[in-house]
């Protein structure tokens, strides 16, 4: 199997004017209602599991079409109504001025006492975060498009040219460090791409191993280190590199329920962020390892570790790794024989295998044999 | 107070040959003892609090001169003796070949069953990590100099040219992302420095704020984001920028016991790593904020948060933030009126103040007023 860049399916879509237009349209609607003496309201797509489903065709976790109507003249709704308008005004200012704020800054910036009362606009960040999520759902835009940045984590190494504002640089010419992925990647462009695919790697130590072994150059791969669960910025970057630049996505994590969960989130999206799956998830992603079959295949029995938690057939179980494993066995997107086999083997053996355990063969092994062989022979999980 | 680059006090010192020489000298000593029919041994500086002290003059946490002798022909020592030799051989190979390994890889790579026995060389990483620390102490080198890399975290933004192997780039031309600090910075060089000082920032969100506000350019500052507790790589980078490049170091954290602990570790080193203070710590570092006095000075009373845990005068206390606060009150390096005042105010008021709370004034406030004013007026804590 030779990995090659394919045709793009999406276009660069960052457009602050579009976001401003949506905000203004919504605000004008409210204004008209006020002028007409009506009770103004927002229609907010309902959150929670009851309004989430797995779209088999698109292979994405998606948001349903249930709406909750939030009125101004309703004692139960008025506070949230006010908070929504405050944050809409704030986002408009951010986007107009080309500035970004973190969720925490957005909270602090908008916390004040309402004149003539002892009431605060927001008591806690747990009040402002959900309103920003509501705005994402109502407007159908990512909070990054509203210039509210997410936590940043993860870095990139490989032969592509990244353009961020006026700066342009090659992400394989930054020494061993690599480029730190910012909280928002909406505006990033890729004027030059000299790689055939993206290898997403769970741990920094493994990404560094591959960089040191010159894997990116030899295999024409772009390495993205997630450093644990992939941040929103990294997930959006993966999505864009696949859909806008046509790069195949291969994911490489530890062989354990947490690693597989990281893969699942990159591929299918998460239930919490179901309304964002179409922009954050990459259902075409494939999984190279680690798998339970790798343990036998590569003779790694003596460097496995025990799963944490209580197995389902023991008192108090399942907990820990076992609990997550059982959940994964039931994921709609893991209902195929390859994944069922790996998950059931993990349950049966009660072990996990780390990426770095491959160092037991030799430091080079992962870069010169394990990955190239598995990818060449197409030994990838769906 | 105008911050300016001063004279270097240390030189670029990375020299793999020096490390190899030390390893070989030690190995030859053992070999000679074996040849002479003697019982071979290592002298290992004793770990633990009993062998750690605060050097008032150097203002550093340092390791004392107590030694433990580890014999081969001693049932209680033989296993560790073997492990030490295994890891010495491994480090020699790494350094000779110019390769790096993580602590975890070093463990996996050296775990095997001793032929003819059921005994493993290492059962767990908790056996190999302390041996690597022993080697650091015995040889007086950082584990990074032995090519064992630490966890990587943190990024850098500002007008300096970084040279890593054949790559050279300006850390202010990488868009908003910045340069991801690698696990090992020993070999990094700085051919060009166009900044007057280093501003070390605890949170990524605040570092990103300052970058967006063009603080690095306007104030000729290099931003280093630690993203929580500073990684070893970041601490070594700060040390080198100060001692080899003469840059003043200013630290900016949340105004809470954890933020002050981050500062303390950058400045004085930590008890666990006392033997490394001379290479990792930077006693000349100064602290700009957040302080308890900032709360009144800038009218931030309504955006403080309560300290976590139980106060010392309540049943079960002190725990959480309060416990750390009490410890900090007793640190030798916080025995000055400025720090005692801040720590006691925190204890009295029971509150903390975050960096991002400054967004309550305006997004620009921190970059255009708070930091420039405090630094210009020299309102820095020792």
Curated annotation (Swiss-Prot), chains A, B:
GO terms for molecular function: ATP binding; DNA binding; DNA topoisomerase type II (double strand cut, ATP-hydrolyzing) activity; magnesium ion binding. GO terms for cellular component: chromosome. CDD domains: TOPRIM_TopoIIB_SPO. Belongs to the TOP6A family. Gene3D superfamilies: 3.40.1360.10, Winged helix-like DNA-binding domain superfamily/Winged helix DNA-binding domain. NCBIfam families: PRK04342.1-2. GO terms for biological process: DNA topological change. Residues 14-155 form the Topo IIA-type catalytic domain. Homodimer. Heterotetramer of two Top6A and two Top6B chains. Mg(2+) binds at residues 202, 254. It catalyses: ATP-dependent breakage, passage and rejoining of double-stranded DNA. Keywords: ATP-binding, DNA-binding, Isomerase, Magnesium, Metal-binding, Nucleotide-binding, Topoisomerase. InterPro entries: Spo11/TopoVI_A, Spo11/TopoVI_A_N, Spo11/TopoVI_A_sf, Topo_VI_alpha, TopoVI_A, TOPRIM_Topo6A/Spo11, WH-like_DNA-bd_sf. The gene is top6A. The active site is at 108 (o-(5'-phospho-dna)-tyrosine intermediate). The keyword Protein biosynthesis does not apply. Its cofactor is Mg(2+). This is Type 2 DNA topoisomerase 6 subunit A.
């Amino acid at each position: 199997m030779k990995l090659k860049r394919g045709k793009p399916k999406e276009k660069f879509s960052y457009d602050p004017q579009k976001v401003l237009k949506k905000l203004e349209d919504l605000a004008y609607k409210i204004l008209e209602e006020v002028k007409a003496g009506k009770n103004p309201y927002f229609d907010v797509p309902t959150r929670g599991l009851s309004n989430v489903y797995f779209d088999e065709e698109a292979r994405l976790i998606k948001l349903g079409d249930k709406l909750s109507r939030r009125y101004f003249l309703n004692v139960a709704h008025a506070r949230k109504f006010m908070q929504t308008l405050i944050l809409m005004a704030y986002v408009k200012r951010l986007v107009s001025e080309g500035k970004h704020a973190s969720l925490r800054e957005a909270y602090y910036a908008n916390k004040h006492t309402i004149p003539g009362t002892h009431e605060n606009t927001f008591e806690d960040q747990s009040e402002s975060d959900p309103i920003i999520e509501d705005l994402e759902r109502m407007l159908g835009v990512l909070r990054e498009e509203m210039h509210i940045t997410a936590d940043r984590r993860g870095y990139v190494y490989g032969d592509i040219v990244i353009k961020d504002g006026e700066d342009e640089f090659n992400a394989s010419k930054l020494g061993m460090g690599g480029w730190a992925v910012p909280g928002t990647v909406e505006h990033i462009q890729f004027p030059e791409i000299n790689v055939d695919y993206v290898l997403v790697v769970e741990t920094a130590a493994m990404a560094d191993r591959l960089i040191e072994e010159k894997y990116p150059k030899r295999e024409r791969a772009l390495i993205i280190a997630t450093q644990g669960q992939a941040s929103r910025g990294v997930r959006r970057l993966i999505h864009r590199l696949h859909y806008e630049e046509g790069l195949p996505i291969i994911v490489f994590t530890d062989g354990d329920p947490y690693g597989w969960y990281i893969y699942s989130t990159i591929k299918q999206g998460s239930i919490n962020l179901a309304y964002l799956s179409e922009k954050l998830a990459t259902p075409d992603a494939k999984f190279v390892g680690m798998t339970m079959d790798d343990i036998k295949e590569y003779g790694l029995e003596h460097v496995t570790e025990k799963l944490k938690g209580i197995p389902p057939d023991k008192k108090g179980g399942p907990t820990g790794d076992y609990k997550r494993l059982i959940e994964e066995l039931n994921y709609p997107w893991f209902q195929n024989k390859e994944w069922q086999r790996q998950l059931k083997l993990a349950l049966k053996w009660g072990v996990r295998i780390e990426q770095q355990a491959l160092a037991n063969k030799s430091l080079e092994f992962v870069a010169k044999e394990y990955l190239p062989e598995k990818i060449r022979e197409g030994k990838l999980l769906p």
